[in-house]
């Protein structure tokens, strides 16, 4: 991919700026119900209806997630949608016992991972300047960048899923080492967390747990 220059660069920048202006004019903020659905009153779910999630919806979920920002557009996250019985049996090897049924009953479990060598794709993702030297031969810096930005993308993924009418249940009660051996052996991918997707059975919920008030965790400098 070749980066635009000169008049072409001026044109694409002007188009991007105008697109933002139009979007702001159409709907500057989400309404309270939309915010409730994605965050304020959203819940983590661990029981599921016997209702499939279509492949088309998963494609749409990724497309929305991919629009979220990352440092230098690195986009290090990788998503494995575990839907088959065979795939779930493989994933079950990594889970703590109490989490196995939660995963097995979900229509989809996404493995949220990141590529430690994301920088190899920067000529495509960040074409106007070669940023590969920032990462090549610097594994600690690459890993920190991949983990941080992959985690951001995992959060975008959960919010996008809720916006599309799906329920989510993130899980960290598993062995990253076993997941990496089972699904990513011989690659540069590393698992971060798991996220069950589907249509929840809300009868398994308990009350929403408390959150800190602003003054407890926020300050000004």
PLM feature segments, named:
Residues 86, 181-184:
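Short secondary-structure transition/capping segments
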Residues 200-221:
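C-terminal domain-closing interface element
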């Amino acid at each position: 991919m070749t980066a635009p220059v000169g008049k072409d660069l001026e044109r694409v920048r002007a188009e991007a700026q105008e697109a933002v202006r139009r979007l702001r004019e159409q709907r500057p903020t989400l309404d309270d119900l939309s915010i409730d659905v994605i965050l304020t009153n959203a819940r983590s779910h661990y029981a599921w209806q016997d209702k499939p999630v279509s492949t088309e919806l998963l494609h749409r979920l990724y497309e929305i997630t991919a629009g979220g920002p990352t440092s230098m557009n690195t986009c290090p996250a990788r998503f494995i949608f575990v839907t088959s019985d065979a795939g779930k049996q493989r994933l079950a090897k990594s889970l703590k016992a109490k989490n196995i049924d939660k995963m097995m009953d979900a229509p989809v479990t996404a493995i949220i991972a990141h590529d430690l060598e994301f920088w190899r794709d920067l000529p495509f993702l960040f074409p106007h300047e070669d940023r590969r030297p920032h990462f090549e031969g610097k594994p600690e810096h690459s890993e920190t960048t991949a983990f941080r930005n992959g985690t951001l993308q995992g959060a975008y993924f959960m919010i996008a899923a809720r916006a599309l009418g799906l329920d989510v249940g993130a899980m960290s009660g598993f062995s990253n080492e076993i997941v990496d051996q089972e699904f990513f052996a011989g690659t540069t991918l590393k698992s971060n967390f798991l996220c069950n997707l589907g249509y929840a059975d809300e009868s398994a919920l308990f009350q929403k747990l408390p959150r800190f008030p602003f003054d407890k965790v926020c300050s000004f400098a």
